[in-house]
Swiss-Prot record:
The gene is katG. It comes from Mycobacterium sp. (strain KMS). Keywords: Heme, Hydrogen peroxide, Iron, Metal-binding, Oxidoreductase, Peroxidase. Belongs to the peroxidase family. Peroxidase/catalase subfamily. Disulfide bonds: none annotated. This is Catalase-peroxidase. Bifunctional enzyme with both catalase and broad-spectrum peroxidase activity. Its cofactor is heme b.
């Protein structure tokens, strides 16, 4: 195998990109911000906390209305007719965008893959679950070039079936159907992805040019190439890696390092990663017919293009004249026949480095005959591979896996079926959210919980259990802390975590510093004993799970705290949670859910550089809270005195443990002056303006509700004399929301 890395410059010297290309991304100038554009508040005060992220994706922007129920609409879909229609689209070439080999399988597989492949484990963002590929920036990423055509090809399907199928489900399913029509047996498919109607709020990177890498690697050298968290891609505008190698250097082993890291950040191990690349490249091709600059991306294209981008000036601009990535690689020469040809070709040839007609680095079979059919009937081609394809052979670990599959293709098919299913569904959360008859058996990566196999507790049982909990000797603080630790692990991004399963008693959650393991060790045995006593004596087959009891105990404590402040209120409780086992819990997978900061508990893990108040908003976002809900919850939890480690920061009340609006009243008291502590970092002291005596201490998590103008406006409402009842009601409503965040069984129909 030969290589020549003396010239790694992009083929288009006038491009604003940082490197040559990705698997299907054109060489185009990066969009430039409009000069002298009006400044926004973010421009004037970039360090100010932006709470608007908590109000994205609200019902005002949803044309279907707040009462639309996708599960009910989907239930009316004729799935078999729908499947036939999708396959017909795949197998019917259109003159306006001719299909390679008369079949769109490769294009649709890439569309589905790139929709799902944005998922990243650290914050659960990305993935195919919301149809985000329709919106900027994803619809205009270099890596998604010409996927606008794939979605337009599917428009007749969406138009025909309407609201019975979401764009998110259609985009994901199209790749599944493409594989099945080729003869591949998939592991199944689940529907249930609901569309969003505006771009999701997500930091994709800080680079200001397409294909930039400098910010996410922070200038690290090749000996210590570490991708910053939470990013899942090596390069701005790419799904995973640059297929020409890191920063366009065509080194298969260096590329393998990037592949392993980025796929790992999508929760894929080495075998799953290899399977996805081998299987995903069994059908289709890349497109780099000529060294030309294509037109602007969809978001920057002229209005008459109607949302289509990357107009190609070469020849016909499509078919064999298509320029998408600048790479011109045909893996197996088919879009309609599943086979093991990818590995047979990869291992059946020696490879030498060359360049595509567009000037992109790729490999060509050395001294090989032209045996690969042309997609439009032209002369046959020599076998070609991407740099990242050769990584599957040259990397010792990937090579061991793929060599085995060369001789045992049935093992590769099984591995790919499982990995593809995981790829398509990783961001959908628990299996209770899945719809349709093609759902596969639960896997551990879905964080399974047992089905309910007993009668649930009734109102009388609930009242009795509340009494037992409150008489157990456990304090309001212990009960609230435990319930919060259990439920607040939820992430609305990928629907993981939450109270269902009671995994707060299992590894790794019971050992997380933020959950105060020593306190859990005191509380959980007492609750387990109450559970066991009830289950042993209850009639009619009724039982209560520990997951339910933890939430019920926290709710009982909130009711007591409200009563101690003079308010009678019922905290709604919905039984139906079950208890997961340690065997159903992947410790490594759950480790990424550990909170780095939880402003609601005034907790921050050492070493965090982001300002704590911004991390508070991030936590609220993951809990699917609005700004008023975040405000009410934090203010209530402060007066309940449930800070991490018993800290008194922000406990602005003389009656800790009683649910009152004291936090807001005292925060906004102009008789208190705040200054940073001279003794303790990141702590503020509130002193009486007249005497200078310290009245309170606080962190930025607390003071932001008086400093930020938006949050202060909300805090003022809760501090009003006529809002005492409202505060308690709003706190309880927000508390119940957090406790039920993962109860998808309550809201499907």
């Amino acid at each position: 195998m030969s290589s020549d890395t003396s010239d790694t410059r992009p083929p288009h010297s006038d491009s604003g990109t940082q490197s040559n290309s990705e698997s299907e991304n054109p060489i185009i100038d990066s969009p430039e911000p409009k000069a002298h554009a009006p400044l926004t508040n973010k421009d004037w005060w970039p360090e100010q906390v932006d709470v608007s992220v908590l109000h994205k994706q609200n019902d005002k922007g949803n044309p279907l209305g707040e009462d639309f129920n996708y599960a009910e609409a989907f239930a009316q879909l004729d799935l078999e007719a729908f499947k036939r229609d999708v396959i017909e689209v795949i197998q019917t070439s259109q003159d306006w965008w001719p299909a390679d080999y008369g079949n769109y399988a490769g294009l649709f597989i890439r569309m589905s893959w790139h929709a799902a492949g944005t998922y990243r484990i650290f914050d659960g963002r990305g993935g195919a679950g919301q149809g985000s590929q329709r919106f900027a920036p994803l619809n205009s990423w270099p890596d998604n070039a010409n996927l606008d055509k794939a979605r337009r090809l599917l428009w007749p399907i969406k138009q025909k079936y309407g609201n019975k199928i979401s764009w998110a489900d259609l985009i994901a399913y199209a790749g599944n159907a493409a594989l099945e029509q080729s003869g591949f047996k998939t592991a199944g498919f689940a529907f249930g992805r609901e569309d969003i109607w505006e771009p999701e709020e997500m930091l994709w990177g800080q680079e200001d040019t397409w294909l930039g890498t400098d910010k996410r690697y922070g200038g690290t050298n090749e000996d210590k190439r570490e991708l910053a968290e939470p990013f899942g891609a090596t390069t701005m505008g790419l799904i995973y890696v640059n297929p020409e190698g890191p920063e366009g250097k065509p080194d298969p082993l260096a590329a393998a390092h990037d592949i392993r890291e980025t796929f790992g950040r999508m929760a894929m191990n080495d075998e799953e990663t290899a399977a996805l690349i081998v299987g995903g490249h069994t059908l289709g091709k890349t497109h780099g017919a000529a060294d030309v600059n294509v037109g602007p991306e969809p978001e920057g294209a002229p209005i008459e293009e109607q949302g289509l981008g990357w107009k190609c000036p070469f020849g016909t601009g499509n078919a064999n004249d298509t320029v998408t990535s600048g790479l011109e690689v045909i893996w197996t020469g088919t879009n309609s026949e599943w086979s093991n040809r990818y590995l047979e070709i990869l291992y059946g040839n020696e490879w030498e480095l060359t360049k595509s007609p567009a000037g992109a680095w790729q490999f060509e079979a050395k001294n090989a005959e032209a045996t690969i059919p042309d997609p439009f009937g032209g002369p046959p081609r020599k076998p070609t591979m991407l740099v990242t394809d050769v990584s599957m052979r040259e990397d010792p670990i990937y090579g061991q896996i793929t060599r085995r599959w060369l001789d045992h293709p049935e093992e590769m098919d099984e591995a790919f079926a499982k990995a593809w299913y995981k790829l398509m569904h990783r961001d959908m959360g628990p299996i209770s959210r899945y719809l349709g008859p093609w759902v596969a058996e639960p896997e551990i990566w879905q964080d399974p919980v047992p089905d309910v196999d007993h009668e649930l507790v009734d109102e009388s049982d609930i009242a009795s259990l509340k009494s037992k909990v409150l008489e157990s000797g456990l304090t309001v603080q212990q009960l609230v802390k435990t319930a919060w630790a259990s439920a607040s692990s939820f992430r609305g991004t990928d629907k993981r975590g939450g109270a269902n399963g009671a995994r707060v008693r299992l590894e790794p959650q019971r050992s997380w510093e933020g959950n105060e393991p020593a306190e859990l060790a005191k509380v959980l045995p007492t609750l387990e004993q109450i559970q066991q006593d009830f289950n042993a004596s209850a009639s009619g087959g009724k039982k209560i799970s520990l997951a339910d009891l933890i939430v019920l105990a926290g709710s009982a404590a909130v009711e007591k705290a409200a009563k101690d402040a003079g308010y009678e209120i019922d905290v709604h409780f919905a039984p139906g949670r079950t208890d997961a086992s340690q065997e159903q819990t992947d410790v490594e997978s759950f480790a990424v859910l550990e909170t780095k900061a939880d402003g609601f508990r005034n907790y921050i893990r050492p070493g965090q550089k982001t300002s704590v108040e911004k991390l508070l908003v991030e936590k609220a976002y993951l809990l699917d809270l609005t700004a008023p809900e975040m405000t009410a919850l934090l203010g209530g939890l402060r007066v309940l005195n449930v800070n991490h480690g018993g800290s008194k920061h922000g406990v602005f009340t003389n009656s800790p443990g009683a649910l009152s609006n004291d936090f807001f009243v005292n925060l906004l008291d102009m008789n208190t002056a705040w200054k940073p502590s001279e003794n303790t970092e990141n702590v503020f002291e509130g002193r009486d303006r007249a005497t200078g005596e310290i009245k309170w201490t606080a962190t930025a998590n607390d003071l932001v509700f008086g400093s930020n103008s938006v949050l202060r406006g909300i805090a003022e409402v809760y501090a009003q004399d006529d809002s005492k009842d409202k505060f308690v009601e709003d706190f309880v409503a927000a508390w119940v929301k957090v406790m039920n965040n993962d109860r998808f069984d309550l809201e499907k129909f």
